[in-house]
Amino acid sequence: MPDTSNPGLTTAGHLHPLLQWLGMSLPIVQAPMAGTATPALAAAVSNAGALGNLGLGASPADSAREQIGATRNLTGRAFGVNLFCHQPAAPDPAADRAWLQHLAPLFDESGLTPPAELHEIYGSFLDDDAMLAVLLETRPAVVSFHFGLPRPAQIQALHEAGICLMATATTQEEAQAIEAAGLDAIIAQGIEAGGHRGRFDAMTGVNTPTDEGLGTAVLVRLLVRFTRLPVIAAGGIMDGQGIRAMLGLGAVAAQLGTAFILCPESAAGAAYRARLKGAGAFHTRLTAAISGRPARGIANRLIERGDLPGAPRPAAYPRAYDAARQLHAAASARDDHTLAAHWAGQGAPLARELPAAELVALLARELQAA
């Protein structure tokens, strides 16, 4: 691994040593986006000189192995994978029942009886020895983490395998924890970002119960000033002008997610694409109603129901996701997509519908001209 202790500024033609080590020719990272990013998307982005990523946080180890292998078959360049490091949800049957009762009208209209209980539909990397074994076997160039940090033994094993490690921070305290844990870079996620907020679990003692909601620009400046690791900006960045702005603030690269959803290589369905191209893209909401953790998506009826005044607190993450997915599946069977989780950032209306390689090339031209 290169020395990444001094983030510096990324200027035209001068990439940070970490990006050079990864073989990147552009300071652009495609966000992992579990359920939307595909091997085809990640490979196309990497082949274009940026860094593609797979979102494997909700995938079992065998599926992760297959996706990594499929990506490697499509590119000889570096790519990354992302995993979730949330604390397992403590069983709370009373909270689950209250949440299901609140969602009962949506189940009724779908012709469903609310389930008797909710399940933790996927686990955490913290307790996933099989996933660690897959990573050590396949050795992707980058492994990044959301919702917290892996265990020290996991970090050591991955580093010994020559893997570059990154984690998401939404506050200065989280960034300091990432630095103290010995990781190689920080992904600074502003409040504008689509999908799940990467906040550390409160029980880790790193973060406060209240989300400070820092925007990307402010967060990047804070982390560049008060940490020594390279900072990758994430949240609301949709074009080369946005990338240039983040580099000017001291970030070494920019991570874009929503910008890639309309690419034909993404797994986004027709309804998701239509909403992203429609008026609804101007109205994203940060809500815990879908999964149990705060996440930004295009407003829909499930979000409206979940965020009603006086509504109970959603079931714990990812147990609330169990209810949301059942509702979405039933509604989709009727061609009703108003309960689906269409994650998107605040810059969603700026999305362009282009093949991934063409989008990366356009971003590079815009960056050069900015």
What is each stretch, according to the model?
Residues A104, H196-I232, I237-A370:
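Conserved active-site-proximal phosphate/metal-binding subdomains
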Residues P2-F226, L363:
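Active-site entrance/lid segments in N-terminal catalytic domains of soluble metabolic enzymes
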